Swiss-Prot record:
This is Major cell-binding factor. Common antigen and a major cell adherence molecule. Most probably involved, with PEB1C, in a binding-protein-dependent transport system for an amino acid. May be involved in binding to intestinal cells. The lineage of its organism: Bacteria, Pseudomonadati, Campylobacterota, Epsilonproteobacteria, Campylobacterales. GO terms for biological process: amino acid transport. It is found in: Cell surface. GO terms for cellular component: cell surface; extracellular region; outer membrane-bounded periplasmic space. Keywords: Signal, Transport. Belongs to the bacterial solute-binding protein 3 family. CDD domains: PBP2_Peb1a_like. SUPFAM superfamilies: Periplasmic binding protein-like II (SSF53850).
């Protein structure tokens, strides 16, 4: 009986050790797989001036977040050219990370408590605030002038909630129309199908023209983090350390792109 109990304890211990070993391998697997395949796959946007915008002439995506992604590739693989960029938007970036299509997402992904329960976020690499782009002919001076206005926002973004709460605080009602990408919102604004285009101010800067302006209002500061899967703690730590250790370089890249 004692012999059987000893065997049972040994089996339980062995099983626990196997599970721990398996979990450790899983945690380190992403970083090792990137090194093994010799390529980092990063989800970035392709419609955000300054951050990540498709160059129609070359077919390349260029911008601040692309350069941050290249810096990460250099950190992991020693070569910033060992990278593959996958175009994402606010609606697709999470699912593409979930299904393994990308190793990480660097795509104006705002850090929120709700999102941190689903994904790992690095320390912020950039901070901004939400704003409103409107047509000058509307003569809006602030959100307070926009009672009943229809505001264009991106699908699955934090903007709708932030503007909705701000409007409620000042006692006005606004409506929202959701779009798959930023150019679609700007087109709707130009066609007067929406009264405002709302997203982070530095993004709006890329869409201002002689007929539009950004209102002085700022809403709910946004912090962007590099996003990885929740089950990759070792990779998440590597990415977080990368952001901390390369802060000066990342800040310089932001300035390079006019942010």
């Amino acid at each position: 009986m004692v012999f059987r109990k000893s065997l049972l304890k040994l089996a339980v211990f062995a099983l626990g050790a196997c599970v721990a070993f398996s979990n450790a391998n899983a945690a380190e697997g992403k970083l090792e797989s990137i090194k093994s395949k010799g390529q980092l796959i990063v989800g970035v946007k392709n419609d955000v001036p300054h951050y990540a915008l498709l160059d129609q002439a070359t077919g390349e995506i260029k911008g601040f977040e692309v350069d941050v992604a290249k810096l990460l590739a250099k950190s992991i693989l020693g070569d910033d050219k060992k990278i593959k960029l996958v175009a994402v938007n606010a609606k697709t970036r999470g699912p593409l990370l979930d299904n393994g299509s990308v190793d990480a997402v660097i795509a104006t992904f705002t850090i929120t408590p709700e999102r941190k329960r689903i994904y790992n976020f690095s320390e912020p690499y950039y901070q901004d605030a939400i704003g409103l782009l409107v047509l000058k002919e509307k003569n809006y001076k602030s959100l307070a002038d926009m009672k009943g206005a229809n505001i264009g926002v991106a699908q699955a973004a934090t903007t709708k909630k932030a503007i909705g709460e701000a409007a409620k605080k000042i006692g006005i009602d606004v409506k929202f129309s959701e779009f798959p990408d930023y150019p679609s919102i700007k087109a709707a604004l130009d066609a007067k199908r929406v009264d405002a285009f709302s997203v982070d101010k530095s993004i709006l800067l890329g869409y201002v023209d002689d007929k539009s302006e950004i209102l002085p209002d700022s809403f709910e500061p946004q912090s962007y983090g590099i996003v990885t899967k929740k089950d990759d703690p070792a990779f998440a730590k590597y990415v977080d350390d990368f952001v901390k250790e390369h802060k000066n370089e990342i800040d310089a890249l932001a300035k390079k792109w006019g942010l």
